[in-house]
Amino acid sequence: MQTNFRGRDFIGDLDFTKEEVETVLDVAWDLKRKRALGEPHALLRDKVLAMLFFFTSTRTRGSFEAGMAQLGGHAAFIDSETTQISHGDTAKEIGEIFGRYFDGIAIRQCDWQYGNQYINEVAKASRAPILNMQCDVYHPFQCLADIMTVIEKKGRDLKKKKVVVSWAYAASYSKPISVPQSLILQMTRFGCDVVLAHPPEFK
């Protein structure tokens, strides 16, 4: 078990080793069990997570807010359009300011060829850990949830298990590239045979 997570960012799928990902999944299953049994698990009591969204979200926002509440903390939803970012607040300033206000900063910034750069710039300036709720390159938390589901359905030994990813969500290939890319990066570490199905125009 790998337990050196305190204060670390999770921006790219490969930021954590395979062993660390397995530890995260073990903790997730334990928390899922405790919630199902009604056992107390307020591990984040009095902690506040900033959730900065540049793009809309259904599942990611809902799951992060629910997760923080279930762990005894609070998730502060922040729409970028309601901030001073459009008036000049830089990524560095956001990192410095939010890093002082909050215990963690989660960001969704999917602008093509900029989102990941922005999140990393915030991380460099922040004293609080940064979580990637999706950028133009990675969608690490959705990928972890997908791996949990596959293991629950197919067992822990995923070697040579075939995982087929359909990549046809949007008219532009750039918008959803983070989802299949994260799945390919992470699931192959577990030995999966990942197949990417896509229209011929998506090259």
Q: Could you describe each region identified by the protein language model?
A:
Residues 1-66, 138:
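Positively charged, low-complexity intrinsically disordered leader regions
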Residues 54-66, 151-203:
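Glycine-rich phosphate/diphosphate-binding loop of Rossmann-like nucleotide-binding domains
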Residues 29-33, 147-152, 184:
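Generic structural signal for well-ordered alpha-helical scaffold segments
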Residues 12, 133, 198:
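Thr-Gly-centered strand-to-loop micro-motif
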Residues 42-152:
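Phosphate/diphosphate ligand-binding glycine-rich loop within oxidoreductases
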Residues 35-39, 91-93, 181:
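A generic local structural motif
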